[in-house]
Swiss-Prot record:
<feature type="binding site">
    <location>
        <begin position="82"/>
        <end position="83"/>
    </location>
    <ligand>
        <name>NADPH</name>
    </ligand>
</feature>
<dbReference type="InterPro" id="IPR043133">
    <property type="entry name" value="GTP-CH-I_C/QueF"/>
</dbReference>
<dbReference type="Pfam" id="PF14819">
    <property type="entry name" value="QueF_N"/>
</dbReference>
<comment type="function">
    <text>Catalyzes the NADPH-dependent reduction of 7-cyano-7-deazaguanine (preQ0) to 7-aminomethyl-7-deazaguanine (preQ1).</text>
</comment>
<comment type="pathway">
    <text>tRNA modification; tRNA-queuosine biosynthesis.</text>
</comment>
<dbReference type="GO" id="GO:0033739">
    <property type="term" value="F:preQ1 synthase activity"/>
</dbReference>
<dbReference type="GO" id="GO:0005737">
    <property type="term" value="C:cytoplasm"/>
</dbReference>
<feature type="binding site">
    <location>
        <begin position="249"/>
        <end position="250"/>
    </location>
    <ligand>
        <name>NADPH</name>
    </ligand>
</feature>
<dbReference type="InterPro" id="IPR016428">
    <property type="entry name" value="QueF_type2"/>
</dbReference>
<dbReference type="GO" id="GO:0008616">
    <property type="term" value="P:queuosine biosynthetic process"/>
</dbReference>
<feature type="active site" description="Thioimide intermediate">
    <location>
        <position position="181"/>
    </location>
</feature>
<dbReference type="Pfam" id="PF14489">
    <property type="entry name" value="QueF"/>
</dbReference>
<keyword id="KW-0671">Queuosine biosynthesis</keyword>
<comment type="subunit">
    <text>Homodimer.</text>
</comment>
<dbReference type="GO" id="GO:0006400">
    <property type="term" value="P:tRNA modification"/>
</dbReference>
<feature type="binding site">
    <location>
        <begin position="220"/>
        <end position="221"/>
    </location>
    <ligand>
        <name>substrate</name>
    </ligand>
</feature>
<dbReference type="InterPro" id="IPR029500">
    <property type="entry name" value="QueF"/>
</dbReference>
Length: 274
């Protein structure tokens, strides 16, 4: 299925009775082929989704709530279109379940089927909400740099590295990532952290490159994979990890992580804008 066929950007009828058919899968393949990624992926990782508007009824009719977190493997053939995900989760609102575990298991089954891979699901109960604290990305902020730029479409030629000097290891981040939904044109605001081992990457060029996504249209996952591929090709790091966290839309935030080495999955931190 294509994004144009999805509910995104269209008037929708909201149902409050559970309906798994609302989930709309989109194949990763086409967007990956457009940036030179074939069947052999140059990375592994996960897409972390947080859902803040999940509610259902218990067996006695009393509303229940939870914050849901989904871990979608990067090698899944499909992603779920975000508005369809919102509509799907909304369909739980007037549906009775015996327990929170039953809700979790239902969501895991449905979303895994839509993505074509096993998706991990975690539900945080209200008494644990206090543990959902704000954090910040570790590393050196690129946003401190005072620079000029006028490039607002992705341009890998902005990336420079000291290819003939001794390798370094560093972590940098920026809060200036912005792209746009390819269907609705709505802005997607995010932060991105890059950790690498290899030739020193020019910080000004890297920040200009991140800023260059400002008028780009692409889903969150696709933007992160393009950043990964461009940095890997232009700067030739031996190890590379790219982690982006986007602000929520429709009660959902999406946080893709990609790496080419054995690195633990990142913390599902909550940045200030999330």
């Amino acid at each position: 299925m294509t994004p144009e066929q999805s509910p995104l950007g269209k008037a929708s009828t909201y149902t409050e009775q559970y309906d798994a058919s609302l989930l709309f899968p989109i194949a990763r393949k086409n967007a990956r082929e457009a940036i030179g990624i074939g069947a052999q992926l140059p990375f592994f990782g996960t897409d972390i989704w947080n859902a803040y508007e999940l509610s259902w009824l218990n067996a006695r009719g009393k509303p229940q709530i939870a914050v849901a977190t989904f871990f979608v493997p990067a090698d899944s053939p499909n992603i779920v279109e975000s508005k369809s995900f919102k509509l799907y989760l909304g369909s739980f609102a007037q549906t009775a379940f015996e327990s929170m575990d039953a809700v979790r298991d239902t969501i895991r089954r449905d979303v895994s089927a839509s993505c074509g891979a096993t998706v991990s699901v975690h539900l945080t109960a209200p008494y644990k909400f206090g543990k959902l604290q704000m954090e910040e990305f570790e590393g050196l902020s690129l946003d401190r740099l005072d620079l000029d730029t006028d490039v607002y479409q992705p341009d890998a030629s902005l990336l420079k590295a000291a290819l003939h000097e001794a390798p370094v290891e560093e972590t940098v981040f920026s809060n200036l990532l912005k792209s746009n939904c390819p269907v609705t044109g709505q802005p997607d605001w995010g932060s991105v952290q890059i950790h690498y081992v290899g030739p020193q990457i020019d910080h000004a060029g890297l920040l200009r490159y991140i800023i260059s996504y400002r008028n780009h249209t692409g889903f969150h996952e696709q933007c992160v994979e393009r950043i990964f591929v461009d940095v890997l090709k232009a700067c030739k790091p031996v190890k590379l990890a790219v982690y982006a966290r986007y602000t929520r839309r429709g009660g959902l935030d999406i946080n893709p992580f990609r790496t080419n080495y054995n690195l633990p999955m990142p913390d599902n931190m909550r940045l200030a804008r999330q």
